[in-house]
Amino acid sequence: MIGRLRGTLAEKQPPHLIIDVNGVGYELEVPMTTLYRLPKVGEAVTVHTHLVVREDAHLLYGFAEKRERELFRELIRLNGVGPKLALALMSGLEVDELVRCVQAQDTSALVRVPGVGKKTAERLLVELKDRFKAWETSPAMFTLVSDGPLPVASESSAEADAVSALVSLGYKPQEASKAIAAIKDKAGLSSEELIRRSLKGMITK
């Protein structure tokens, strides 16, 4: 089991990364909440990981915080929730927001995540309620996203990367493009910032 990687961020193509550890490149998929916190390509990075072994592939998922990884593990234990849906849920909602939804049994945000209908949201919240009794929300422990703008990137490539990342989460290409187009004052924003703002707009609308 690979539990943590520490190395150099070699590539960043949302939602995928490659981390170079002593000359070996590890490819990972990460939730957007982790993506927002990553350093620039070429800088040192540490991520907590979860390995999924399938017959046709070994898939590695990365997280900025241990609690993100624990949440991911709780989600994929649920009936009908695979890694893709778990990452979509975690990308649309910060950890503390998802925990509060579970505690309040509030489906309103969950149903805006691709692949989650009302019945599915209700079932997930019920199944997670007992598991989350020990999870207390704390801004200091759970706030994973800063409020400031992220580094500037090429406008055309940033928008294309953002659309691609949203599609990988399950949104339709038209929905993704529309969400990016709806962002005000987006000139010069990084793909990470575009993804963050578009997800916030779609989940909280």
From Swiss-Prot:
Pfam families: HHH_5, RuvA_C, RuvA_N. GO terms for biological process: DNA recombination; DNA repair. It is found in: Cytoplasm. CDD domains: UBA_RuvA_C. Its main location: cytoplasm. Residues 154-205 are annotated as: Domain III. Residues 1-64 are annotated as: Domain I. The keyword DNA-binding applies. Keywords: Cytoplasm, DNA damage, DNA recombination, DNA repair, DNA-binding. GO terms for cellular component: cytoplasm; Holliday junction helicase complex; Holliday junction resolvase complex. One of its GO terms (molecular function) is four-way junction DNA binding. The keyword DNA damage applies. It comes from the Bacteria. Residues 65-143 are annotated as: Domain II. Homotetramer. Forms an RuvA(8)-RuvB(12)-Holliday junction (HJ) complex. HJ DNA is sandwiched between 2 RuvA tetramers; dsDNA enters through RuvA and exits via RuvB. An RuvB hexamer assembles on each DNA strand where it exits the tetramer. Each RuvB hexamer is contacted by two RuvA subunits (via domain III) on 2 adjacent RuvB subunits; this complex drives branch migration. In the full resolvosome a probable DNA-RuvA(4)-RuvB(12)-RuvC(2) complex forms which resolves the HJ. Has three domains with a flexible linker between the domains II and III and assumes an 'L' shape. Domain III is highly mobile and contacts RuvB. HAMAP family: DNA_HJ_migration_RuvA. This is Holliday junction branch migration complex subunit RuvA. The gene is ruvA.
